[in-house]
Structures are given as structure tokens and as C-alpha cells.
Amino acid sequence: MDKSIVLNICGVKSLGGLKVVNSAINTISESEYQLIILHNNNLTEPIDTDSNIIKIETSLKRFFHPFLNIFLSRKDITTINNSDAILHFGNFGFKTKNKSYTLIQNLLPLEIKDFKNIILKYFINKSFKQSDYIVYQLDHVAEKINIRFKSKLMKIGIIDKGEKDLNTEIGVIGIMSKTRNKNSNFMEEVLKRVSVDSPEYKITKFISTENQKHSEKNLISLSEQYPKHNIYFHASFYETVGLPLYEASSAGLFIVAPDSEYMMYFDNSNSIKYKPEDIESATRCIKDALNSNKKTIQSLHYKEDWNLVLESI
């Protein structure tokens, strides 16, 4: 196997990010390319199970990741530069001599103008400038990317539709997290009101974690919860995809989520959209969904087509 591709996953830490990495690994592992994974020393999944994958590990913190071409060993940077391509996950990477791709996975630096996100946006734009392609998943993300990079854009996200029976077990499930973007305080208040007004309905608050060591257990636990509910409540401010929305829809749940850009792919056949940050609106939409006589939904299933990347190398 003479051809190789590097996946730089040093910036990946969320469950959603790990799922995207797994999707890429599964496709590339079946191709003609030798897979090389560059990761930090905190990552325990998903790379420890395949002995055919070449692994390069760094202990450098996130601040150094845009400069890994300087701080990695000569052996490691030579291995990377000798590969056919590198795909940077987590919004930005570092300069290399091969064909490079940057996958945008976090919209916050493009939306929020605090000190941290201004710095991140600088590195993102620098990575976009250095990259041959900017890879994105869904169309609303492309609208956030500076127009001077439009010629580099490559879309890999696909949404499939299909009719599915709505789950018969009645209840509401929402995912909460310490991450500010997940808007968990708002979700907590809305679900509290629903439980007070309608105590007969089951309310489940699933606590997500950024700890990768427990990610597989988390994913299994969440997938087991979906069939026990018929309503999925979402509250995030921003999403590049919002994987739980599609997982819940595919699992037979009706979606209640804010009327935000990332919800543009859903309609009234599979969702109710509430006014963002409006507790009364969200509470009313959940109650309307619970009292609906709907039996089937037009479910949405999300996936990535990594062959588009491979074909462009």
C-alpha cells in the first residue's frame, strides 16, 4: 500500500466529533490508502483497535496545534509530508507539504466575538488559506465561511428521508451538557415546566460528557433511551450538524427544537420549531407534540460521503 492519508484529530473531543472521525476511518480503511492518525495523548478512542493504522501521538496542548509542523519530531513531520493528503478535523490544522483539507466542526468562532473565539477564528482562517479544500457537512455552514474561500468548499454531508412510525412510548428526552452552547439552563427550565404541568409524562434529561474514556458507554446508553420516548427536545444555540437531531429522528422521535438555521432541513412532518430562547414557546411546542395524534414521521438520517475527499486527492 503506497498511498497514505493523515487524519489530524488532535482537536477532536466531543462525542459528535468522534462519530465523524469514526465515519472517516471506516471509509478510508476500506480504500487503497494507508491510514495515519495524528492524535493527542488524551484520546483513547477510536484508534486503539486497529493494528493496521499508523499512529502519531503528541502531548502538546491545543494552543500548539496550529504549529505542529514546528513542534513535531522530524520523523513524524516527514511521515506526514510524505503522505498524499492530510485532513484536519476540529476547524484548523497546520502547514504541510501535501494536499490538505480542513473540516469545519465548530461554528462558535464564526458566530461569537469574545477573546477566545476571535483567536480561534484567526487560526481557522489561516488554516482555510493554507488548505486546498474546506470540507463542510451541511449547507447552512457554508454560508458562514468567508466568500474568498468559496472556491475551496467541499460538501460531504448527506440527508436521507424515509417514513417511520412514531415511537409509541410517550415521553420527552433532551441532552444536557456543561458546554455553554448546549443551552442546558434553558432546557432545564422548559422541562421543569412541562413536568409540573403534565406530570403524567416521562421526562428524561440525558447528561452528556466530553470525557472520551466514557464516550462509548454514553453512546450506547443514549441509543437505548431513544425507543422509550417519542419526543426529542433540542436547545443548542449553534450546530454544524446536530447529530442527536438526526439520530433521534431516525429512531422514531418527533423533534422539538429552536427555529434556527441548523433546523432548516426539518419541516412540520417531523418537527415543531419554537422561538429561540422563549421558554413559553418551547413549553407550548412540547405540549403540542405530546398531544399530537401523529402516527408516522418523515424521518431524517444523516451521513458523510468521504469518498468525495478520496476522489479529489
Residue ranges and their predicted role:
Residues A85-F115:
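Active-site proximal beta-strand in glycosyltransferases
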Residues F237, S249:
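Aromatic "clamp/platform" in nucleotide-sugar-dependent glycosyltransferases that forms part
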